[in-house]
Amino acid sequence: MKNLIAELLLKLAQKEEESKELCAQVEALEIIVTAMLRNMAQNDQQRLIEQVDGALYEVKPDASIPDDDTELLRNYVKKLLKHPRQ
């Protein structure tokens, strides 16, 4: 029983580490996108936003992906592009 608990705790620690890495990757990408948008002319920003919106609209997600997850992704992308980090 102790071995099982120890094994579960180890797996939990590994998952937590993976989660931290993913969060760091997302933060880094947010910073990069924000910096890029801030250095673009307004018309270039708008063109990029329209291109990304068009690409998202054309993408047909896999049937195994819940609609809520797809909508969450679309909303987050819109938020990031239209209201970048301060």
From Swiss-Prot:
Coiled coil spans: 1-36
GO cellular component, one term: cytoplasm
InterPro entries: SigmaS_Anti-adapt_IraP
Subcellular location: Cytoplasm
UniProt key word Cytoplasm: yes
Main location: cytoplasm
Keywords per UniProt: Coiled coil, Cytoplasm, Stress response
Domain of life of the native organism: Bacteria
Gene Ontology BP terms: cellular response to starvation
Function: Inhibits RpoS proteolysis by regulating RssB activity, thereby increasing the stability of the sigma stress factor RpoS especially during phosphate starvation, but also in stationary phase and during nitrogen starvation. Its effect on RpoS stability is due to its interaction with RssB, which probably blocks the interaction of RssB with RpoS, and the consequent delivery of the RssB-RpoS complex to the ClpXP protein degradation pathway.
Subunit record text: Interacts with RssB.
Family in the record: Belongs to the IraP family.
Identification of the protein by name: Anti-adapter protein IraP
Biological source species: Shigella boydii serotype 18 (strain CDC 3083-94 / BS512)
Originating gene: iraP
